[in-house]
From Swiss-Prot:
The lineage of its organism: Viruses, Riboviria, Orthornavirae, Negarnaviricota, Polyploviricotina. This is Polymerase basic protein 2. Influenza RNA polymerase is composed of three subunits: PB1, PB2 and PA. Interacts (via N-terminus) with PB1 (via C-terminus). Interacts with nucleoprotein NP (via N-terminus). SUPFAM superfamilies: PB2 C-terminal domain-like (SSF160453). The record marks E627 as: Avian adaptation.
C-alpha cells in the first residue's frame, strides 16, 4: 500500500508527468530490450511510427529508373538521399500506388492455377443461395470439421515432399514420392506451373492449402461439410441462423461421403460371407472411389464413421479410442470399470448373459442429431443430460443411454422374446438385442423407468415418459438441456485389433465397434464407386451379376482355360461364381451343375470337342454342388428382369450372345468383352502354362521320344524330360521339377518360353 500511495503522490506532481512524456529514454536496459535481436517488439507501434515518416520504405537503386521522381499530382515518390547504413533509396508509400497503377504487368495465366482455392471459393459463393434469417436458440456443439474446401488428402509429410518437388525441384534433400496421389499431383502441378513468375514461397503456401486437410474444433449447428464451414460466420450466430445452399461441391466432401457409402456396403456384404474379415479386406483392396484406390483413401482420410473405422482397423490402421453403441459415439471422460459376466432375466423370463460394467463412469454421447452427458454406476443410471434437434432425436438418445446403463428396470421392461439376427442370420449379442427391442417400441421402457420431481435449473427442463417437456417432473435421472455436448476433440489414434467377425477391440479388450453399429442408411454416392470384387456384383441387382460373371470369365480366360482342363474342382469353387447361384432356380441348381460337369468331362475326354464359347456359356452353372442324374437339358433358366430367362446349351440366346465375326460377347444386350484367344501368344492353347512343376525347356528334342499329351505328363518321374503336344499342335520339351519350391513361377516362365520355343 505504501508504494502505491508513494506512486500516486509522484504522479500528481507535474514534473513526474514531464519526465515520463517529454524526456528521451536513455536507460541502457530499455534500449537493449527494444533494439536487441531481429524480432520486432512492438510491431503495431513501429508500423504507425514508420508510416508517419515521409519515406518509410527502402528499395533497390534500380527503382529510380523504373519510377518517376514525382507522380501526376507532383508529389515526390522517392528521395535522392540514401538510406543510412545501406545502399538503398528511401521511397514514399505513394510510389506503391503509382506502381500498382502504372507499373509493368505480367502474364496472369498462372493466378487462377496458384490461387485455385480462392477462385473456386468465389465461384461457390457467387452461385450459392442465401435464404431467410431465422431467430431461434442455436444448439451448437463443437465438432472437428474440415475448414479447407477443395483439398486432396495428403499427410503433412507427403504434401511437403510434393511441394518441394514442384516448387524447388533443384533443392537437395531426400524426397520420396510413393503414393499414387502424390505422383499424379506432382505431374499435374509441374505442368500447370511451368514458367510461373509468382514468388515460389507463395506458390508453396497455396499448394499446401490444396493438398492438406485442415481441421478445427468449431461450434456447429448444421451442415459439417467443408462448403458449409467456409460460410459458418454467415449462417449461424448465437441466436440466429441463415439458410444457405452452397453453389458447388468440392471433391474432398464428395470423397468423404462416397467413402462412407462404400465402407457401409462392404461391411454389410462382408458380414454375410463365410470369412468376414478376409472378404472385407479383399473388397477394400479391389474397390476404387472416384478412380482412386479405396485403401489409399482410407490411409489418408481422417473421417471417423463406424464402417470406415472397421475397414481401417482391418487394414491395421489406428483409429479413435472412442466406442460406438446404438449409433452414438461414446467417450469416457472419467471413472473406470471392470467387466463381469452376469445372467439376467427379462420381463419374459428369458435368460440373457450380459457383460456388466462395474464401477462409476462418465461418458459423452455424440450422435448426428442428439448429444448427451451420461453418469452411471454399476447397472444404474445416475444422470443423463440430453440435447437434440427434436423430440424423436432426444428419444433415440434416451433409449440408447437406458440400455447402456444395464438397469434392471430396463431389462424387466422387455415384452416378448428377444431373437433379433444380423444379416448373416446370427443372433445379435444381448446388448444389441435389448437395443433393437426398445428401438422398435420404447413405451414400456419409459413407463417403467419412473419419474421424479425436478428443481428449476437454468437451461434444463424435464421430459415425461411420453417425451413431452415439463418443468415439474421428469424421467428419473434424465434432463433435457438447451446446450449441446461437444464432440470429443482429441485426434489421438490408438492401435486396435479386429477378429474375423469384424469386432474391433482396443488393447484392453474393450469392444469399440462391431458390424451391428454400421448404419443401415442408404445413400447415393457422389463419386463413382467401382467394386471389382465379385462379392459386390449383387449390389446393382441380378443383371449386374450376370454381366459381371461373364466379363470375369472372359477377362481371365487364359487361367480359366488351364484350370478347366487340369483342375476343374478348384475352378468350380471360385468365389466369383457365388453370386451367380442366386440367379439359378433353387430346385434346378444341383441338376444343372451335374449336367454341365458331365458335359465338360466328355469335352475333356474326347479330343477336338473343346468348344470355348460353350464352356464360357455354361461354366457358371457348374459351380453349384452337383447332383448326378441322367437328366439332359437343351436350355438352362436364370432369374433376371423379374422372370426366368433361358440360356441355350448350344447356340446364342438373348441372355448370352457370341458374335463370331467380331469375337465379342453380349450379355442381356450389354457388351461383356472380346474373346481373344491368348492375345500375346497367338499359339498356346488350353495348356499355355503346361503344368505347375513341369517347366518348359525349349523346342522339341527328338531324343526324348514321341510327343505326349498333357494328361500323360502326370506319369513323369522327378527330373525326367519329355516332348509334349500343346495348344495348336506345337511340340515343346519339358522336364518335371526335382523340387516343389519354385513351382509358383512356372506358369510365368512357361508363357515366355513357349514364345521362344515356337518362334
Amino acid at each position: 500500500m505504501e508504494r502505491i500511495k508513494e506512486l500516486r503522490d509522484l504522479m500528481s506532481q507535474p514534473r513526474t508527468r514531464e519526465i515520463l512524456t517529454k524526456t528521451t529514454v536513455d536507460h541502457m536496459a530499455i534500449i537493449k530490450k527494444y533494439t536487441s535481436g531481429r524480432q520486432e517488439k512492438n510491431p503495431a507501434l513501429r508500423m504507425k511510427w514508420m508510416m508517419a515518416m515521409k519515406y518509410p520504405i527502402t528499395a533497390d537503386k534500380r527503382i529510380m529508373e523504373m519510377i518517376p521522381e514525382r507522380n501526376e499530382q507532383g508529389q515526390t515518390l522517392w528521395s535522392k538521399t540514401n538510406d543510412a547504413g545501406s545502399d538503398r533509396v528511401m521511397v514514399s508509400p505513394l510510389a506503391v500506388t503509382w506502381w500498382n497503377r502504372n507499373g509493368p504487368t505480367t502474364s496472369t495465366v498462372h493466378y487462377p492455377k496458384v490461387y485455385k482455392t480462392y477462385f473456386e471459393k468465389v465461384e461457390r459463393l457467387k452461385h450459392g443461395t442465401f435464404g431467410p434469417v431465422h431467430f431461434r436458440n442455436q444448439v451448437k456443439i463443437r465438432r472437428r470439421v474440415d475448414i479447407n474446401p477443395g483439398h486432396a488428402d495428403l499427410s503433412a509429410k507427403e504434401a511437403q515432399d510434393v511441394i518441394m518437388e514442384v516448387v524447388f525441384p533443384n533443392e537437395v534433400g531426400a524426397r520420396i514420392l510413393t503414393s499414387e496421389s502424390q505422383l499424379t499431383i506432382t505431374k499435374e502441378k509441374k505442368e500447370e506451373l511451368q514458367d510461373c513468375k509468382i514468388a515460389p514461397l507463395m506458390v508453396a503456401y497455396m499448394l499446401e492449402r490444396e493438398l492438406v486437410r485442415k481441421t478445427r474444433f468449431l461450434p456447429v449447428a448444421g451442415g459439417t461439410s467443408s462448403v458449409y464451414i467456409e460460410v459458418l460466420h454467415l449462417t449461424q450466430g448465437t441466436c440466429w441462423e441463415q439458410m444457405y445452399t452452397p453453389g458447388g461441391e468440392v471433391r474432398n466432401d464428395d470423397v468423404d461421403q462416397s467413402l462412407i457409402i462404400a465402407a457401409r456396403n462392404i461391411v454389410r456384404r462382408a458380414t454375410v460371407s463365410a470369412d468376414p474379415l478376409a472378404s472385407l479386406l479383399e473388397m477394400c483392396h479391389s474397390t476404387q472411389i472416384g478412380g482412386i484406390r479405396m485403401v489409399e483413401i482410407l490411409r489418408q482420410n481422417p473421417r471417423e464413421e463406424q464402417a470406415v473405422d472397421i475397414c481401417k482397423a482391418a487394414m491395421g490402421l489406428r483409429i479413435s479410442s472412442s466406442f460406438s453403441f446404438g449409433g452414438f459415439t461414446f467417450k469416457r471422460t472419467s471413472g473406470s470399470s471392470v467387466k463381469k459376466e452376469e445372467e439376467v432375466l427379462t420381463g419374459n423370463l428369458q435368460t440373457l448373459k450380459i457383460r456388466v460394467h462395474e464401477g462409476y463412469e462418465e461418458f459423452t454421447m455424440v450422435g448426428r442429431r442428439a448429444t448427451a452427458i451420461l453418469r452411471k454406476a454399476t447397472r444404474r443410471l445416475i444422470q443423463l443430460i440430453v440435447s437434440g434437434r427434436d423430440e424423436q432425436s432426444i428419444a433415440e438418445a434416451i433409449i440408447v443411454a437406458m440400455v447402456f446403463s444395464q438397469e434392471d428396470c430396463m431389462i424387466k421392461a422387455v415384452r416378448g422374446d428377444l431373437n433379433f439376427v444380423n444379416r448373416a442370420n446370427q443372433r445379435l449379442n444381448p446388448m444389441h438385442q435389448l437395443l433393437r427391442h426398445f428401438q422398435k417400441d420404447a413405451k414400456v421402457l419409459f413407463q417403467n423407468w419412473g419419474i421424479e420431481p425436478i428443481d428449476n435449473v437454468m437451461g434444463m427442463i424435464g421430459i415425461l415418459p411420453d417425451m413431452t417437456p415439463s418443468t415439474e417432473m421428469s424421467l428419473r435421472g434424465v434432463r433435457v438441456s438447451k446446450m449441446g455436448v461437444d464432440e470429443y476433440s482429441s485426434t489421438e489414434r490408438v492401435v486396435v485389433s479386429i477378429d474375423r467377425f469384424l469386432r474391433v477391440r482396443d488393447q484392453r479388450g474393450n469392444v469399440l465397434l462391431s458390424p451391428e453399429e454400421v448404419s443401415e442408411t442408404q445413400g447415393t454416392e457422389k463419386l463413382t464407386i467401382t467394386y471389382s470384387s465379385s462379392m459386390m456384383w449383387e449390389i446393382n441387382g441380378p443383371e449386374s451379376v450376370l454381366v459381371n460373371t461373364y466379363q470375369w470369365i472372359i477377362r481371365n480366360w487364359e487361367t480359366v482355360k488351364i484350370q478347366w482342363s487340369q483342375d476343374p474342382t478348384i475352378l468350380y469353387n471360385k468365389m466369383e461364381f457365388e453370386p451367380f447361384q442366386s440367379l439359378v432356380p433353387k430346385a434346378a441348381r444341383a441338376q444343372y451343375s451335374g449336367f454341365v460337369r458331365t458335359l465338360f468331362q466328355q469335352m475333356r475326354d474326347v479330343l477336338g470337342t473343346f468348344d470355348t464359347v460353350q464352356i464360357i456359356n455354361l461354366l457358371p452353372f457348374a459351380a453349384a454342388p452337383p447332383e448326378q442324374s441322367r437328366m439332359q437339358f437343351s436350355s438352362l433358366t436364370v432369374n433376371v428382369r423379374g422372370s426366368g430367362m433361358r440360356i441355350l446349351v448350344r447356340g446364342n440366346s438373348p441372355v448370352f450372345n457370341y458374335n463370331k465375326a467380331t469375337k465379342r460377347l453380349t450379355v442381356l444386350g450389354k457388351d461383356a468383352g472380346a474373346l481373344t484367344e491368348d492375345p500375346d501368344e497367338g499359339t498356346a492353347g488350353v495348356e499355355s502354362a503346361v503344368l505347375r512343376g513341369i517347366p518348359i525347356l525349349g523346342k522339341e528334342d527328338k531324343r526324348y521320344g514321341p510327343a505326349l499329351s498333357i494328361n500323360e505328363l502326370s506319369n513323369l518321374a522327378k527330373g525326367e524330360k519329355a516332348n509334349v503336344l500343346i495348344g495348336q499342335g506345337d511340340v515343346v520339351l519339358v522336364m518335371k521339377r526335382k523340387r516343389d519350391s519354385s513351382i509358383l513361377t512356372d506358369s510365368q516362365t512357361a508363357t515366355k518360353r513357349i514364345r521362344m520355343a515356337i518362334n
